[in-house]
């Protein structure tokens, strides 16, 4: 994790699917399809065009992570390139999605967390809902969280507009 005294080495920003889908697809293909073995037909579910998306960029402009918020308040497809994990990128992406959810009027968000990263989501205020289940061949747990306290843009966000689709 980056100490508070060090400047962030990345930014996170909302993006339009139509303008950035090749970049979003490349990140997700690398993390989910190649690294985790998710079948491509499950990864590309047809919901991206109407979702809110964010991308994390290294300061040199390299895309390093992404996530999305669906119109039903479901957060998903949170992916960080392996070399950037453990440096606050995933946390910043999630925080950005929570602020977007709050600003769009969602009181509560939900997600399906891979069981190996449950603690990451617990630290961000998510609560487990129900038993483990398999999704795309990976063990998951449903989780929910209020967005009421998520009103300030994360430090990694350089602007103020929210993009969708």
Ranges and model annotations:
Residues 55, 61-79:
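Conserved beta-strand in the GNAT
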Residues 29-59:
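Active-site rim helix/loop that mediates acceptor-substrate recognition in acyltransferases
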Residues 115-141:
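Conserved active-site alpha-helix within GNAT-family acetyltransferase domains
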Residues 50-54, 76, 139-143:
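Short beta-strand micro-motifs in enzyme catalytic cores
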Residues 1-18, 150-165:
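Conserved N-terminal entry element of GNAT/NAT acetyltransferase domains
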Residues 84, 88-96:
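Conserved acetyl-CoA pyrophosphate-binding loop and the N-cap/start of the following alpha-helix
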Residues 101-114:
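Conserved GNAT acetyl-CoA-binding A-motif
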């Amino acid at each position: 994790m980056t100490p508070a005294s060090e400047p962030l080495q990345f930014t996170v920003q909302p993006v339009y699917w139509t303008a950035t889908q090749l970049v979003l697809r490349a990140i997700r293909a690398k993390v989910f399809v190649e690294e985790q073995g998710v079948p491509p037909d499950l990864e590309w579910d047809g919901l991206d065009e109407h979702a809110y998306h964010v991308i994390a960029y290294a300061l040199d402009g390299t895309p390093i992570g992404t996530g999305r918020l669906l119109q039903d308040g479901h957060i998903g497809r949170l992916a960080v390139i392996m070399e950037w994990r453990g440096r606050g990128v995933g946390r910043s992406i999630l925080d950005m999605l929570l602020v977007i959810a709050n600003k769009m009027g969602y009181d509560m968000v939900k997600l399906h967390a891979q069981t190996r990263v449950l603690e990451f989501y617990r630290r961000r205020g998510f609560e487990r809902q129900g038993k483990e289940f398999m999704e795309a061949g990976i063990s998951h747990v449903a989780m929910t969280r209020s967005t009421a306290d998520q009103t300030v843009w994360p430090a990694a966000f350089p602007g103020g507009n929210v993009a969708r689709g």
